Amino acid sequence: MRIVFMVALAAALPFAAYADSAPTNQTAQAILDRVLANRPMKDFSLKARLFVGTEDPVPVEIFVKNTPGETRTLYRGRQTEALVVQPLHGEPKFYLRGVGELTGNQRTQKLLGSNFTYYDLGLAFLHWPNVKLLDEDRVRGRDCFAIEARADGEPYPRVELWIDKEYYALLRAEAFDTNDNLTRRFAVTSFKKIGDAWVPRGLEASRVPPAQSLPSEEKSRLEVYEGDYDTHLPVDWFATEKFHAESGGGRNGTD
């Protein structure tokens, strides 16, 4: 079975996973390297609905441009257009049409008012150097590696990851604040076959309010209903120059 995952957001970082025999005694870094290496080289596009609270769902289009050195993912919904540039090696960069590059706390702005932030879409924690293997676990009936990642100067100092042991795909991530309280959770909830590929049909992003715990959480959900896994997308759609700040204000991520 071939699986194409957009993790955490569902849109986050796309990658392809193939069943493979796993070497024994792997390190956490070796496992994450395999996750990052398992990505498609084809362009593809998806149509989805973003559910935020009790409001009507927001139509979202997701376009993915893959090259040997990086993945560029474009999100379009309402008046918002956001771009995530994820090098194969290195930190992701984030751009918002009419605003320009997002840096610092700007990276944690919400996509269309949801609990999916731009920072989450880049899955930067997959690149953090301080990682360790915690144990083996199960998520939605799948055997997983449980991995802890830590980093200084990031929105979350600690993240726990659950990686599917067969397909080397991220199925769940939980982020913790400086007091080691669970603050965010991302999960793949279901899958859909598009052509010869399987993609996440449902993805959830949950925010846990301060001093509270699960299930007292605020959820947003992205549901994919259509896609084209073998398409050719225009290069200029993904040019960072198109996202420069506009004088007098521009679009924002909560339109």
Which residues are covered by each model-predicted region?
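Bacterial N-terminal signal peptides
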Residues: 4-14
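A short, Trp-centered hydrophobic/proline-enriched beta-strand micro-motif
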Residues: 38-55
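Extended lipid/amphipathic-ligand handling interfaces
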Residues: 35, 61-66, 188-193
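Gly/Pro-enriched, hydrophobic low-complexity segments
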Residues: 140-238
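Solvent-exposed loop/turn segments connecting transmembrane beta-strands
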Residues: 53-58, 78-81, 153-156, 179-183
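Sec/Tat signal peptide C-region and signal peptidase I cleavage site
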Residues: 15-19
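Flexible, processing/modification-adjacent segments and terminal tails
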Residues: 20-33, 37-42, 87-158, 165, ...
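Solvent-exposed N-terminal domain segments of exported/luminal and surface proteins
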Residues: 43, 69-76
